[in-house]
Amino acid sequence: MNASRQGAVGPTIAVAAGKGGTGKTLLATSLAVALAENLTSGPARRGVSTVQLLDCDVEEPNADLLLQPRFISRRPVSIMVPQVSKTLCTLCGLCAQKCQFSAIAVIREVVVTFPELCCGCGVCAHVCPERAISEVQRPVGVVDLGRTEEGIEFVQGRMNVGEQRAGPVTRATKRFIEPQAISILDAPPGTACPMQETVEESDYCLLVTEPTPFGLSDLNAAVETCRSLHVPCGVIVNRDRPQEGYQPLDEYCRAEGLPVLLRIPETREVAEAYSRGRTLARAFPEWAQPLREMYGQIKKSIPSA
């Protein structure tokens, strides 16, 4: 288990994909439903109190469309941005030199700040020799908290329109991870910073892919990202076509030592259910057991889980 989560009972499982549209959110929500139903109707898992679904795709969260939670509260997310005192500032330019994000600049005899570029690190205020820079709060998004009919604790981060940095809202969303819960993180698509911010410090990452050349290419990028973060990962093949197959995908997984934990067939029934906003576990009860068995495999591969 990740060192930062020592003492936690339930694992944190991220669900990611190299690109959008692979079925990542369908898998994350279906797994959450299957596990939550097992907690309430099946034998209770030792020490685990509940299942959480955290939608960390903060630019465009949509897991709520499938789970239909009842939202209970909303928490604002803000970062600290610089405010420069014109009377104290000597225009030395040290703040602009140290800012890695070009969020502050000295232009002629004026200090200009660009709040939308600021990450809130505070280095400008720290290095100012005249103490001319103070910090003020700037709203960047919200975190919505709710609960589904199965008892899933639902956490959804959402950036304000026009914001450019997902990191602050993603981190705020992840602060609601509970150590006594099975926490499933729906990551944003791709392998850029927002995905890495979500997957980082997870106990395991499920990578959803498709049996196509593009799917394999994106999977390779996602695997490399997980390994750079030291997060173990397994593969879910969505839209699987057993009759046709795609040998390079299976060969890649074998060569890289990646377990293929689940295959979701390409059927009209699954596509129709998804288009109506239904998870696998709700639309097809027979899918609940394979999802739970997959979770059991994941648990076995997490040290001390």
Predicted regions located by residue number:
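C-terminal lobe/tail of nucleotide-utilizing enzymes
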Residues: 2-6, 225-305
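Walker A (P-loop) phosphate-binding motif
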Residues: 3-39
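Short beta-strand-centered segment that lines the nucleotide-binding/catalytic pocket of NTP-utilizing
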Residues: 40-42, 46-64, 137-143
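Switch II (G3) loop of P-loop NTPases
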Residues: 56-57, 156-161, 165, 170-195
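Inter-motif core of Ras-like GTPase G domains
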Residues: 194-213, 219
